[in-house]
Amino acid sequence: MNPNQKIITIGSVSLTFAAICFLMQIAILVTTVTLNFKQYECDPPATNQVMPCEPIIIERNITEIVYLTNTTIEREICPKLVEYRNWSKPQCKITGFAPFSKDNSIRLSAGGDIWVTREPYVSCDPGRCYQFALGQGTTLDNKHSNDTIHDRTPHRTLLMNELGVPFHLGTRQVCIAWSSSSCHDGKAWLHVCITGYDKNATASFIYDGRLVDSIGSWSKNILRTQESECVCINGTCTVVMTDGSASGRADTRILFIEEGRIVHISPLSGSAQHVEECSCYPRYPGVRCICRDNWKGSNRPVVDINVKDYSINSSYVCSGLVGDTPRNNDRSSNSYCQNPNNEKGNHGVKGWAFDDGNDVWMGRTISEDSRSGYQTFKVIGGWSTPNSKLQINRQVIVDSDNRSGYSGIFSVEGKSCINRCFYVELIRGRRQETRVWWTSNSIVVFCGTSGTYGTGSWPDGADINLMPI
């Protein structure tokens, strides 16, 4: 074979090998793409709103005669449907409540930068739960914490953290507020934030991080709202707001809000005489609230909200074991479903209850006169029978030697039912503890359980002598 023939033969063989390698590279690439796209294949999106897609990176390092290195294929993940919550599942059947969360904010404040807060609450989006509180514009170990017993200042803001995370310096300040309510409609958060002068406050409605609407004070006397979660059904959120006397006749209105925009306002109707600081929960197809009568009754008002036609009805919890503080002792307390009981009605505390057929679950302080201790129980016939007093399944949440405060309800949707949970505000500092100049709180949270449970007490737990003054 002459030199030219050798060159031609070697060239032909090289070209053949190169062609084979090229074809194998194409085959490997096609196989990789096909397998990955089949693995993540999804149905076409429905007409509902979808979440923005995010790129997914697939990397393969393959060695096969030639080197195919860091092949990157970008594609969109399957669209995730986002729907309004309708809360149509039944309420979970429970035997009592089990411990869920405790943030220990005051104990942590002894050695860390933790916000001074009050009026805490809990609310959940479809994926996780968050704790809220009204901050005082200062941390506890800061001279600005002096005299933070006052409720309404321009420095107060609504704080939001994942449940169980204390309000540290990196906490998000959602809005300016000395009274608030928050809820998630399935697509985004709604925050109702009230601030301003007592005689001319403003309520801002913030939806999906944007200010959408507002309303000014209608009675020029401390416009205020729930201090716990609002409720959204099929895109319509309801929030109870009051403007007027805290110890006399006031003007309560129920606002209906869609994606941050006020679409309707209904006046309070029914037999409730005074309504403040409502603890609301979904009772499909409507919303039900248990509130505070700060004027005439130590029995709690009930507000029923019809989301479809905007109608309102109100009454009082029937249980003769009443829920407010101060109150008469259980032997002499009364409630007959329709009217305030005129028993130590002036003053009170935010609280909660919820119906369970003809019965009622409720929480209240252990003390009849002060915000000390906390207990829960079920009253047989307490929702439907006037002055019913048969109590079962009592639990102590905070023993009577320790302070409590506000409490409220929030709802969590499970696979088959809607569970009811509650939080208790554990107030520390002034007025009772005069060694320090600040007033703040931590929280403890319990949720309904169908299982068994033990006993205990979950107070704030901070030694006031170890705290900054």
Curated annotation (Swiss-Prot):
Transmembrane segments: 10-30
Reactions mediated catalytically: Hydrolysis of alpha-(2->3)-, alpha-(2->6)-, alpha-(2->8)- glycosidic linkages of terminal sialic acid residues in oligosaccharides, glycoproteins, glycolipids, colominic acid and synthetic substrates
One cellular-component annotation, GO: virion membrane
InterPro entries, A to Z: Glyco_hydro_34, Sialidase_Influenza_A/B, Sialidase_sf
Protein topology in the membrane: Single-pass type II membrane protein
Annotated residues for binding of Ca(2+): 293, 297, 324
Residues on Intravirion side: 1-9
Residues annotated as the enzyme's active site: 151 (proton donor/acceptor), 406 (nucleophile)
UniProt-annotated binding residues for substrate: 118, 152, 276-277, 292, 371
Molecular function (Gene Ontology), one example: metal ion binding
Record bears the keyword Ribosomal protein: no
Record: glycosylation sites: 61, 70, 86, 146, 200, 234, 313, 402
Localisation: Virion membrane; Host apical cell membrane
Reported function: Catalyzes the removal of terminal sialic acid residues from viral and cellular glycoconjugates. Cleaves off the terminal sialic acids on the glycosylated HA during virus budding to facilitate virus release. Additionally helps virus spread through the circulation by further removing sialic acids from the cell surface. These cleavages prevent self-aggregation and ensure the efficient spread of the progeny virus from cell to cell. Otherwise, infection would be limited to one round of replication.
Family that this chain belongs to: Belongs to the glycosyl hydrolase 34 family.
Domain remarks in the Swiss-Prot or TrEMBL record: Intact N-terminus is essential for virion morphogenesis. Possesses two apical sorting signals, one in the ectodomain, which is likely to be a glycan, and the other in the transmembrane domain. The transmembrane domain also plays a role in lipid raft association.
Subunit structure, as described in the record: Homotetramer.
Protein name: Neuraminidase
Native species: Influenza A virus (strain A/Swine/Kanagawa/2/1978 H1N2)
Species classification: Viruses, Riboviria, Orthornavirae, Negarnaviricota, Polyploviricotina
Gene assigned in the entry: NA
